[in-house]
């Protein structure tokens, strides 16, 4: 239809600007309405497309490019987010559950398609759309501390099998639909897919490791390498007549181990989740014909019900069969079911690929009716799945990680390189950068107290920014100023009866100077000052000094905001989310802080409001065992509060404490210092002193 804004010229710049504006404004509005942000993007696509104002044209080259990149990025991130370490631990069980949660929904979708008169090929593709799933409930189980539960790990691992199998079925169905299918051709196609998959999974993994090893800390080039890998794999898949999303997903799996939890991964995901993936969802809205969509919901309502109910029930049957075969509890089986319900990433990308597959007769493999129904399915399952996870997952007991703690620590490679601070034969060394004179006094005092407790030394570090020429007059003045700072720091340490070994570096990168000096001096701990700018947009886009030190340092890093003399800290709050080896390390650090002043450490755990009294008591018992594992000699009060807003509780409780100890979680962020959502909110609102602790590779 001719839109109201038809006079506006259509060009890539205008299209891109509109897409950015929509991506920025609409998702937060819909989230305030308790709806997923992607619903807002779909709504925007409908309003701006042919069924609304006609501002954006889905057939324009720029829109096609943006949505294609978004689709590729969506599948790449889906492969990148799979935890390969957990998958390797449970691969046999994951294969069993993956086979069940693929086969049962596939057969169900096939039956639904044939019942409603679709061809066998289209019905098989419909079944494959049922088979995959998106782990929208992962943040819930992660918040509850049950990610290490075997049933949850198996469900996560099964995602690899379901997504790969569904994408392979898509490739075959598109080949058949194009008319180029024959038994011999199918064999050739399968061989080509197998060879191509091996080249991507093995070749890209090897190339990535070699490139990252040779480039060291050159994150910009590594970032470009990852982008090249994604799009090269996508182009390669099209060369063998397989949809580009297959290559993107395989590329995500291939570079998964190479990236680990590095800053490069965070920035790659940041680019996709904030820019290109939202464009894909807007593009889906542009494809929707609103009158046809309403017709689907009314005249073809039985098809909608059959697809939605068939998907949910088939996933339930697969979960029950796996629960029975693997010996899990009913609650674990129901949680597996809830996690496998949401249909977003692979499902939607495959549905769009099928919709865009047109044969010589002009027929689409996935009809407009089915595409509309799949969108309804996505909306319903993306809401129902997480709601069910939130209902069933809290009933799963938190895994008893203490029983296997020693085994995990003995194998740091298997456990994500956990590095407890062991007693060393050499002198305990604390490194304190002196970049900010206003915070130097308290930071150095804290470092000296810890070093004195360990009969160690403190290294005040001053860094002069390196100019192009070493005879620059500005460098001379900076060196003089830094030498004065080091002299003051040495006097302060001497007053606290601690040996100080000052160090002065000339470097053009502050973070690199800190991490290199720490390694050269064999430091056991780095203490830095907190900057509120670390939470700003610039830091999230480009990183910060704190972020870089967190990622590059060989030893634990403690970033502190100290509002008073550290010797006055007598009440320390230690929030404890779940019992892991990393928690043990952080608690050991907190013990050190407490013992320097004879402070009392209070352990606080915030659990969901619907947690049963039995579960609360069980967690208290686990924490008591945890303290015994730490060989705690003092009494440590334990608090458990049931509330759904952990950040709000922690901020409120922190008012009565002198110091709060928090951890930097790298996994769940997209840029800057990687913080959990709760930690990020706490740091923005907390009014007391705090320590943000990060250990290498965590």
Swiss-Prot record:
Family membership noted in the UniProt record: Belongs to the monovalent cation:proton antiporter 2 (CPA2) transporter (TC 2.A.37) family.
Pfam assignment, any one: Usp
Subcellular localization, as worded in the UniProt entry: Membrane
Its membrane topology: Multi-pass membrane protein
Name of the gene: nhaS5
Superkingdom of origin: Bacteria
Stretches that traverse the bilayer: 10-30, 35-55, 65-85, 100-120, 121-141, 156-176, 184-204, 222-242, 275-295, 300-320, 333-353, 370-390
GO molecular function (one): antiporter activity
Protein name (Swiss-Prot/TrEMBL): Na(+)/H(+) antiporter NhaS5
């Amino acid at each position: 239809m001719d839109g109201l804004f038809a006079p506006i010229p259509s060009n890539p710049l205008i299209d891109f600007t509109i897409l950015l504006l929509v991506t920025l404004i609409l998702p937060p509005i819909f989230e305030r309405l308790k709806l997923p942000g992607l619903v807002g993007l779909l709504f925007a696509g409908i309003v701006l497309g042919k069924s609304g104002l006609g501002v954006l044209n889905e057939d324009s080259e720029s829109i096609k490019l943006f949505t294609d990149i978004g689709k590729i990025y969506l599948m790449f991130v889906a492969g990148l987010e799979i935890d390969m370490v957990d998958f390797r631990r449970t691969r046999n069980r994951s294969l069993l559950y993956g086979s069940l949660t693929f086969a049962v929904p596939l057969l169900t979708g096939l039956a639904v398609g044939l019942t409603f008169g679709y061809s066998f090929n289209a019905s098989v593709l419909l079944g494959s759309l049922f088979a995959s799933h998106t782990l929208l409930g992962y943040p819930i189980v992660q918040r509850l501390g049950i990610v290490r539960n075997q049933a949850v790990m198996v469900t996560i691992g099964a995602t690899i099998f379901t997504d790969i199998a569904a994408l392979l079925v898509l490739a075959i169905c598109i080949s058949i639909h194009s008319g180029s299918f024959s038994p011999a051709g199918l064999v050739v196609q399968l061989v080509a897919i197998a060879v191509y998959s091996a080249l991507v999974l093995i070749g890209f993994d090897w190339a990535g490791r070699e490139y990252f090893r040779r480039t060291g800390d050159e994150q910009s080039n590594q970032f470009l390498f990852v982008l090249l890998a994604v799009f090269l794999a996508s182009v390669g898949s099209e060369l063998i007549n397989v949809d580009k999303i297959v290559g993107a997903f395989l590329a995500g799996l291939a570079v998964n181990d190479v990236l680990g939890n590095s800053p490069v991964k965070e920035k790659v995901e940041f680019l996709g989740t904030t820019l290109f993936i939202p464009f894909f969802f807007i593009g889906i809205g542009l494809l929707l014909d609103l009158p046809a969509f309403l017709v689907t919901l009314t005249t073809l309502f039985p098809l909608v019900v059959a697809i939605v109910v068939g998907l949910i029930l088939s996933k339930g049957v697969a979960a029950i069969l796996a629960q029975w075969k693997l010996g899990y509890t009913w609650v674990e089986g129901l949680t597996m079911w809830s996690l496998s319900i949401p249909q977003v990433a692979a499902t939607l990308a495959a549905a769009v690929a099928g919709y865009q597959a047109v044969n010589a007769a002009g027929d689409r493999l996935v009809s407009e009716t089915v595409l509309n129904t799949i969108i309804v399915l996505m909306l319903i399952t993306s809401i129902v799945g997480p709601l069910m996870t939130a209902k069933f997952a809290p009933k799963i007991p938190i895994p008893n990680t203490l029983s296997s703690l020693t085994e995990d620590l003995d194998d740091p490679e298997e456990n994500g390189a956990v590095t407890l601070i062991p007693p060393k034969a050499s002198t305990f060394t604390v490194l304190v950068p002196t970049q900010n004179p206003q915070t130097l006094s308290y930071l150095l005092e804290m470092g000296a107290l810890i070093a004195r407790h360990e009969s160690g030394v403190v290294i005040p570090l001053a860094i002069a920014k390196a100019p192009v020429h070493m005879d620059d007059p500005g460098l001379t003045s900076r060196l003089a100023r830094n030498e004065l700072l080091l002299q003051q720091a040495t006097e302060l340490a001497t007053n606290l009866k601690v040996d100080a070994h000052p160090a002065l570096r000339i470097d053009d990168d502050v973070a690199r100077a800190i991490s290199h000096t720490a390694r050269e001096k064999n430091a056991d701990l780095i203490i830095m000052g907190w900057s509120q700018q670390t939470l700003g947009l610039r830091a999230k886009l480009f990183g910060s000094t704190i972020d870089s030190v967190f990622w590059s340092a060989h030893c634990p890093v403690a970033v502190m905001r100290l509002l008073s003399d550290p010797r006055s800290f007598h009440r320390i709050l230690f929030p404890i989310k779940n019992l892991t080896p990393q928690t043990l390390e952080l608690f050991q650090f907190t013990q050190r802080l407490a013992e320097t002043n004879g402070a009392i450490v209070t352990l606080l755990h915030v659990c969901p409001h619907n947690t049963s009294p039995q579960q609360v008591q069980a967690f208290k018992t686990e924490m008591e065992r945890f303290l015994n594992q730490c060989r705690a000699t003092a009494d440590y009060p334990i608090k458990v509060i049931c509330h759904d807003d952990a950040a709000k509780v922690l901020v409120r409780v922190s008012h009565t404490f002198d110091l709060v100890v928090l951890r930097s979680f790298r996994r769940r962020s997209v840029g800057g210092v990687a913080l959990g959502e709760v930690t990020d909110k706490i740091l923005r609102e907390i009014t007391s002193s705090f320590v943000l602790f990060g250990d290498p590779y965590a």
